[in-house]
Structure formats: C-alpha cells, structure tokens
Amino acid sequence: AGIKKVHNYPLFKKKKLHLVNAANKFTCESLNINSCPTETKFFVKNEKINHAKKYFNKDNYNIVIGAGSSGPDTRWGERNFISLINKLNENGNYFFYIQCGPEQNEISKNIIDKIKKKNCMDLSKMNISEIIPILSLSDMYVGNDSFSHHITTQCNKPSIVLLLNSPKAYSDYSLNHHRIIPENAKLEELDHSSNYQANSISIEKVFKKIVELKS
C-alpha cells in the first residue's frame, strides 16, 4: 500500500497504562517533537451553533447533566441527580440538558419526570452532531465519566466529573476537569475495580462545587 512507516502502541499493556501519558509520549516520539499539549480547542460550525441557540435562554445558567455512562458502576444514579437538580432549582435560575445514550433514555425520562420545575431537556434521542453544539454552548458539565465531558472541557467549559470507578487518567488532560471522588478514596487508586457506590459522593459536595465554579 506504499506505507513506509507504521507506528503503534505496545500490545497487551493496557493494565496500569496511563492513557494520556502514553498518548503524549507516543505522539512526541512518532513526530520527533519535544512536547505535545493535551489541551485542544474544539471548533463547531457557526451554522450548527446558531441552530442550537434556540434551545438556550441567556438568563439561565445552563448545565449539561451527564447521567449516562458505559457501565452502571460508573453512574452516580438517577436519585442523586434528581435531588441535585431540585436543590439547584431552589437556589437559582438554571436549565438542564440531560445527556444519556439512546439505549439509556429511561434514565433521562425518570430524571425529568421527577424534577419539580420543568426546566430540563432530554438529549438522549439526538445524534452526536446535534448534541455537540449544545455542549459547546452550555455553561457547565456535571456528571459521570462519559463522552460529554471530553467535549465540554475542550470547549473551555468547567466540567465536574464524578469519578466512582473510573481511572483518573480519563480526566487528566485538561485544567477544565474538576473531579469529585468518594469520601476517603484516593484519586491515584481509583480504577474499574474500585467498587464504590453512588452514594459515596454526596449531593451536598456536588452542589457546593457547582456554586463555587459558577460564582
């Protein structure tokens, strides 16, 4: 095929592999450069931005709620998000965009049905190209380790990531990540086998972090 040089990660070494550091090293070595910034700038076409603006009111503080994720052990849980949203609604003008995958739309539905103030929008039926402009226009991300926080951080939005049983490496690359971990947990020791329960991160702790970053 005329390919003169092929670069690849070492095989069978994912365990204990720091994904960000490994990618950084691989890129520097492959391109023969000294450093490779991990912060990027995510660009969205103006046409898509303008189309998404119809879902926004500038008088509100607009938060994307990342309620879905790839596995149930990494989810903070519907009850916690419901309590958090209701508490925020008692303390300010907010609007919430509930993000889950299409196969997890019951999570979005259950959350929205139990919010006293009807100020939520379900993103679960939208495709990625429709969701990204909304993420880029939001003021903040709050939620599980899911694809949305990777977009919001690179759109320079503060992103509160609730790390239950996800490695820290997944959110190590951006200053816009604000991680909340279970009580008595150590960030360096979190991984997919940690087995922390959703209630090990309190609603009050998340609420206070939102207020802190918002002010």
What are these regions (language model features)?
Residues 1-215:
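Catalytic machinery of carbohydrate-active enzymes
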